[in-house]
């Protein structure tokens, strides 16, 4: 069996086009365009690339994009003060603080300072809690983007045995909640998991997010499984690969996401979706 490729790049472009049309309709109706504030502290090269892609997406869909590039020496108090200012700004619907933050700044404190109705990354405890309680509003971008991919490919998730490799706050944990909502029987594995191969071999839907190139051999994949590879790893030769050995896995799976061009584009597209949602549901006069 040769797997069908889940083309995240194309689906992400569809999502962005849909958002752009809604923004045009808003502006034509006399409503303001959604606003996103992107905050970058320091000069981490990977972070700069991610931030640039988010700003480009904002411009493409017609958002008002505000950039705050702060020096590495920025104190936690200064960053919190900026967030307070943005929380109070009625033209800003979403606040994104690019992680990781420099040493000496508490990630948790910063993320909790963002108003839940402007938390378009979906990391605030309020939004994570709503997801856990089956009443999601602003949902973490990568897990929600993966659900969108499955939906757009008309993949029926109800009753599937889903296995999530990796238990991070950004992907693994919220992904497990999304999969429960999608009707899966869900297992989350982590560094203390015994016999990882056993879990992988029984997965109808496998989502891998550990950040280790080729971590899951293709021979472990169940025949006909759906494989979602969240990993983005750059090898010494410059090649970008996922956490799954792609060619081997693609020979056994029914569907698989490539790296690059799979999950990555969906994370940014979902951020854009979340910002529009925050604008409509929380900040429009009729949404309150």
From Swiss-Prot:
Keyword set includes Signal: no
Residue ranges crossing the lipid bilayer per the database entry: none
This enzyme's EC code(s): 1.5.1.5, 3.5.4.9
PROSITE patterns to which the protein is assigned, alphabetical: THF_DHG_CYH_1 (PS00766), THF_DHG_CYH_2 (PS00767)
One BP annotation, GO: methionine biosynthetic process
HAMAP family from the UniProt entry: THF_DHG_CYH
The protein's name: Bifunctional protein FolD
């Amino acid at each position: 069996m040769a797997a069908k490729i889940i083309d995240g790049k194309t689906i992400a472009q569809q999502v962005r086009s849909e958002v752009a049309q809604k923004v045009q309709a808003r502006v034509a109706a006399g409503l303001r365009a959604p606003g996103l504030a992107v905050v970058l502290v320091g000069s981490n090269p990977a972070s700069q690339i991610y931030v640039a892609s988010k700003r480009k997406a904002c411009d493409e869909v017609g958002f008002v994009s505000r950039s705050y590039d702060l020096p590495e020496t920025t104190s936690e108090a200064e960053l919190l003060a900026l967030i307070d200012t943005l929380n109070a700004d009625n033209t800003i619907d979403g606040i994104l603080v690019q992680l990781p933050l420099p040493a000496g700044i508490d990630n948790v404190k910063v993320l909790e300072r963002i108003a839940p109705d402007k938390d378009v990354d979906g990391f605030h405890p309020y939004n994570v809690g709503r997801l856990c309680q089956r009443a999601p509003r602003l949902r973490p971008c990568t897990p929600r983007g993966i659900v969108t991919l499955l939906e757009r490919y008309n993949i029926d998730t109800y009753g599937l045995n889903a296995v999530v490799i990796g238990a991070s706050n950004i992907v693994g944990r919220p992904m497990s909640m999304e999969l429960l909502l999608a009707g899966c029987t869900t297992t989350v594995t982590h560094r203390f998991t015994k016999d990882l191969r056993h879990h992988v071999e029984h997965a109808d839907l496998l989502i891998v997010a550990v950040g280790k190139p080729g971590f899951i051999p293709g021979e472990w994949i169940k025949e006909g499984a759906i494989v979602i590879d969240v990993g983005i790893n750059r090898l010494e030769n410059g090649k970008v690969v996922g956490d799954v050995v792609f060619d081997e896995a693609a020979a056994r799976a029914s569907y698989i996401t490539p790296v690059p061009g799979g999950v990555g584009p969906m994370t940014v597209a979902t951020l854009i979706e979340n910002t529009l949602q925050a604008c409509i549901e929380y900040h429009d006069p009729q949404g309150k």
